Amino acid sequence: MAAGRELVVSFGEMLIDFVPTVAGVSLAEAPAFLKAPGGAPANVAIAVSRLGGGAAFVGKLGDDEFGRMLAAILRDNGVDDGGVVFDSGARTALAFVTLRADGEREFMFYRNPSADMLLTADELNVELIKRAAVFHYGSISLIAEPCRTAHLRAMEIAKEAGALLSYDPNLREALWPSREEARTQILSIWDQADIVKVSEVELEFLTGIDSVEDDVVMKLWRPTMKLLLVTLGDQGCKYYARDFHGAVPSFKVQQVDTTGAGDAFVGALLQRIVKDPSSLQDEKKLVESIKFANACGAITTTKKGAIPSLPTEAEVLQLIEKA
């Protein structure tokens, strides 16, 4: 990671989540919906900024009311939107989210195609990407061309400029043509990443084994990686670095909505790594950073919606002190 740079650049989709006003009902039974800005890479960028870090977003939005609203939300939250482009021929993506009684989610997407899928390599803000200390992305941008090619090119540009590459696959099975295609494409860029974060569900999906034991996790380890993380919801997180591995417990909170918790975790961790890259080699520092990220994720589950519930540094430190 190049010295003196503290910018996290997030690449991918930003969309509108429609969340039912009542938890525990199907989409058809929901009496009404609240619109909430979402999209994992955008959530990560805002999480970084909310914590006082430098963040930018690269992606495509529809040249429509929702797209303009989302760009304004990035700016209002201190995220550099110099990498955002608009498409007059496609709409901003929508997702209808079912909140089960336990706060977990199910999704129904409207993308045929949506603007985020139509970003081309020529539309990339190369200078912005080159400034990244960390370049973060998911796998949804790998599903369709031309966005897939733009994604691969952006990774190349960032890597050549000295950025750490951070990958959260953020599996959304409903968006892929098949489970096999999802697995193949998600793993197609696995070897390039420096930092990878997966959930329990993604670990099972990618390995075919329903276990979080070390030998299963190590199937996803690559010698080129600096850090592999497995998030375990309210059970905390397991971490694997070149010279050490372990687990960090979570914080007990009253969960309302898990939307954005993983993104808050990633944003918090990346913000800490950018501030002190040596934490990737220093277990004590890394554990402190993961603890901070766990607290950030936990707070995010205590309110509805991702972006409104992303905490400030003061709120995170308050939870850590209370615990």
Curated annotation (Swiss-Prot):
Record-level GO BP terms: fructose metabolic process; starch biosynthetic process
Catalytic activity: D-fructose + ATP = D-fructose 6-phosphate + ADP + H(+)
Tissue spec. comment: Expressed in stems, at higher levels in roots, and hardly detectable in leaves.
Pfam family, any one: PfkB
Pathway(s) it belongs to: Glycan biosynthesis; starch biosynthesis
Record GO terms (molecular function): ATP binding; fructokinase activity
Keywords: ATP-binding, Carbohydrate metabolism, Kinase, Nucleotide-binding, Transferase
Record comment: activity regulation: Inhibited at high fructose.
Presence of keyword Transferase: yes
EC number: 2.7.1.4
SUPFAM superfamilies: Ribokinase-like
CDD domains hit by this protein: bac_FRK
GO cellular component: cytosol
Domain of life: Eukaryota
Family named by the database record: Belongs to the carbohydrate kinase PfkB family.
Name of protein: Fructokinase-1
Organism from which the protein derives: Zea mays (Maize)
